[in-house]
Amino acid sequence: MILIIYAHPYPQHSHANKRMLEQAGTLEGVEIRSLYQLYPDFNIDVAAEQAALARADLVIWQHPMQWYSVPPLLKLWMDKVLAHGWAYGHNGIALRGKPLMWAVTTGGGESHFDIGSFPGFPVLAQPLQATALYCGMKWLPPFAMHCTFICDDETLQAQARHYRQRLIDWQEAHQNG
């Protein structure tokens, strides 16, 4: 099962993430957990989230980039759910070997994330990659959809189909491998 942990504080305003979730949702074996819908009070059900992670074959953290980071509820989710003794530390082996993909949308163009006057995309991924590796997870190449504020619907749909294809490719490789 592919588990998408989706965190967008204003999902009604996100055409890009909406398209991505629509495409992913057409696939069999995909569970989408929308954190802002599940936990509007930020009171996370840690046991339910850990159970979902335990069922997953692939975990995806999907969100818009906000100030070069994750939305606040996703950060809180990480702090609470990725607990010592469960996800890391002594006996913390629940996620060991489980693949994780970061799926992120940005308002800026791809060139905005090249190393230069701004931090490069690999630098921005480091905290998430470090978190995954600390929990014993396997970091997969991220999926990034850039320029989401100015993209026309055709471009958003094409990128969302590309996201769906990444998930299909993973499912096929996982089934055969």
UniProtKB/Swiss-Prot annotation:
One of its GO terms (biological process) is potassium ion transport. It is a peripheral membrane protein. FMN binds at residues 8, 14-17, 65-68, 105-108. Its EC number is 1.6.5.2. It is found in: Cell inner membrane. InterPro entries: Flavodoxin_fold (IPR003680), Flavoprotein-like_sf (IPR029039), K_H_efflux_KefF (IPR023948), KefG/KefF (IPR046980). Regulatory subunit of a potassium efflux system that confers protection against electrophiles. Required for full activity of KefC. Shows redox enzymatic activity, but this enzymatic activity is not required for activation of KefC. Homodimer. Interacts with KefC. Belongs to the NAD(P)H dehydrogenase (quinone) family. KefF subfamily. This is Glutathione-regulated potassium-efflux system ancillary protein KefF. It comes from Klebsiella pneumoniae (strain 342).
